């Protein structure tokens, strides 16, 4: 199962993704697509990136902060992961924490 943790603490945002969606390559590919798209966007934006960790073992963590652009990027990635969980809850678990 893929486990996703999303956190908004003021203007600081955390996106963490761990594990493979064993048994469903489509969910695994979709989760990877979402996290790598966000990482690419962050690299090309003016948003402050505190941490970027992406590895080949299905683990990723992005921590970033900023204003409206960072918030919009976070909202978009949350929507993507929550929609994925809605369609495939047996393969992906998403926790959204707003502090």
What does each of the following model-derived ranges do?
Residues 1-27, 35-99:
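N-terminal intrinsically disordered, cationic/polar leader segments
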């Amino acid at each position: 199962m893929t486990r996703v943790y999303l956190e908004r603490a003021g203007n600081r945002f955390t996106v963490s993704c761990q594990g493979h969606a064993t048994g469903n390559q489509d969910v695994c590919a979709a989760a990877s697509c979402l996290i790598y798209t966000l990482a690419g966007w962050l690299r090309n934006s003016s948003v402050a990136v505190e941490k970027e960790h992406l590895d080949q073992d299905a683990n990723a963590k992005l921590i970033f902060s900023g204003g409206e652009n960072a918030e919009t990027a976070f909202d978009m990635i949350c929507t993507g992961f929550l929609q994925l969980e809605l369609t495939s809850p047996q393969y992906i678990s998403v926790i959204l924490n707003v502090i």
